[in-house]
Amino acid sequence: MYRIHARQSMFSRSISDECVEHVLQNGEVIEDYPHAFPFPAKLLIGGCNGRSIHVVAAENSSKQQVIVITTYEPTIEKWEADKKIRRKHP
């Protein structure tokens, strides 16, 4: 399941359903948001078509449903070179 924001960001950033699914199935969890509302969420990173992609997804365990919240390509301004660690800003 995709939130409207996720679909909009995928369209504007040319990120395909296949890339998002690849990251969800094969990506690495780099941040965990256990207290996110209404469902716990995670930030995953994965590669697709030569690009690094971040996917934020929540899990509604009662419906066994994954909800994609947003997806984007991490930028060097916000992420370290490995694209897994947020930069600290003064």
Language-model segments: residues:
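Ribonuclease/tRNase effector modules and their secretory precursors
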Residues: 1-90
